[in-house]
From Swiss-Prot:
Swiss-Prot/TrEMBL catalytic activity: (1,4-alpha-D-galacturonosyl)n+m + H2O = (1,4-alpha-D-galacturonosyl)n + (1,4-alpha-D-galacturonosyl)m
Protein name in UniProt: Probable polygalacturonase At1g80170
UniProt keyword terms in alphabetical order: Cell wall, Cell wall biogenesis/degradation, Glycosidase, Hydrolase, Repeat, Secreted, Signal
GO cellular component: extracellular region
């Protein structure tokens, strides 16, 4: 009897425990529904962080011979219409031959073009017959684009260079494609790429905002004409960092109506150096301001850090800093040239000029291949103002003789050791001259 009572008691206790547990579960479910706690999603319903599109799945052969343009365009169209972040992959073992192509937006979500392999252009300029000769890979109207991958973009420019009027003066001067053009793009990154042998310019930013370029190698022969490395126009908020440029023209060029540009940790050369300009051609109005070039090694170039403007233009170049620049066997290491003339015929003298002011050259050291290591040649009608030379040491490349400075209508100051000796007129004399000129003109 006692065993039966004990068993009954145990059974009752078990029933109470089960009932309590069910009640707690019900209460918990009720509480959870009130707070709308997040539930775990199954693998099939959980959104993926990024969609991957392999160009091979769109028909690309990647053998360097078959035309992969349509496959690439189809992949781009799919990626651009995707509502989730998407990555287009050109894998390491692919060489995609692409004809001129527009890769335009706007796209619905973030898009990454990962070039781990190689993209090549047709090597025959006649492919561009009837097309825009200035374009090859043309990115337009995009936001939040990233182009990366460690691979190579090859413009196959040899035949273009041979047909250039700069190589053969009997040929007409005709435009040639830029390898990578980014037009009206914003919040964009271009990083970890090799861009080589472009038909003309390698990378152009036009009307862009907030762009970061880093980890690039831009390479073409020193004899290749007009093959600027990175060309910036009508753009603002541009950062270029940790990049090597070796081409036949400017390593980096900044032209009309560009501002807020930071350039750092650059290896440049051979080529034509780092340039602002040319500006003011055909009497145009142009402005470039708030530019900093900090930490660069420039070697075996036709110029070092340069500002170049045509006579007859108007506008302003202001708030430019060139700092921590190492020169190795560079002609014209420091140059401002307001008489720039890239023409077969001599340029006529003009009475107007772009104003140049608030320009600093700080801690520029190394060797000059030209006797004139500092050349600041400014306009009679619009002299350069507030030029600073600070801690400059530019010795002859051959170790013999000395270097010189040349100044014309250049006003400013120097500080620290400056060699060759500075030739700037002080700003006080400029003001006195301006006042005197005003008094004289008042009596005429």
């Amino acid at each position: 009897m006692s065993y039966s009572r004990g068993g009954t008691l145990v059974t009752l206790l078990l029933l109470l425990v089960v009932a309590s547990s069910l009640a707690l579960t019900a209460n918990a479910n009720s509480f959870e529904s009130l707070l709308q706690l997040p539930r775990r999603q199954s693998r099939s319903t959980r959104p993926r962080s990024e969609r991957l599109l392999h160009v091979g799945n769109f028909g690309a052969k990647g053998n360097g011979v078959t035309d992969d343009t349509k496959a690439f365009a189809d992949a781009w169209k799919t990626a651009c219409s995707s509502k989730v972040k998407t990555r287009i992959l050109v894998p390491e073992n692919y060489t995609c031959l692409l004809r001129p192509i527009d890769l335009s937006g706007p796209c619905k979500a973030r898009l990454t073009l990962q070039i781990s392999g190689t993209i090549i252009a047709p090597n025959d300029p006649d492919v561009w017959e009837g097309l825009n000769r200035r374009k090859w890979l043309y990115f337009h109207g995009l936001s939040r684009l990233t182009v990366e991958g460690g691979g190579t973009v090859n413009g196959m420019g040899q035949e273009w260079w041979e047909r250039s009027c700069k190589h053969n003066h009997s040929n007409p001067c005709r435009g040639a494609p830029t390898a990578l053009t980014f037009h009206k793009c914003k919040n964009m990154r271009v990083e970890n790429l090799n861009v080589i042998d472009s038909q003309q310019m390698h990378i152009a930013l036009t009307s862009c905002r907030r762009v970061t370029i880093s980890g690039l190698k831009v390479i073409a022969p020193a004899t290749s004409p007009n093959t600027d490395g990175i060309h910036i126009s009508v753009s603002r908020g541009i950062v270029i960092d940790n990049t090597t440029v070796s081409t036949g023209d400017d390593c980096i060029s900044i032209v009309k109506n560009s501002t807020q540009i930071s350039i750092s940790n650059i290896i440049c050369g051979p080529g034509h150096g780092i340039s602002i300009g040319s500006l003011g051609k055909s009497k145009s109005w142009e402005e470039v301001r708030d530019i900093t070039v900090d930490t660069a090694i420039i070697s075996d170039t036709a110029n070092g850090v340069r500002i170049k403007t045509w006579q007859g233009g108007s506008g302003l170049v202001s708030k430019i800093i060139f700092r921590n620049i190492k020169m190795n066997n560079v002609s014209n290491p420091i140059i401002i040239d307001q008489y720039y003339c890239d023409s077969r015929k001599p340029c006529a003298n003009q009475t107007s000029a772009i104003s140049i002011e608030n320009i600093s050259f700080v801690h520029v050291r190394g060797t000059s291949a030209s006797k004139e290591a500092i050349k600041i040649s400014c306009s009679d009608s619009s002299p350069c103002r507030n030029i600073l030379l600070q801690d400059i040491d530019l010795e002859p490349s051959n170790g013999d003789g000395f270097t010189e400075s040349f100044c014309w209508e250049a006003y400013g100051s120097s500080s620290g050791q400056v060699y060759p000796p500075p030739c700037l007129s002080d700003d006080t004399s400029f003001l006195e001259q301006s006042v005197q000129s005003g008094i004289t003109s008042a009596y005429l």
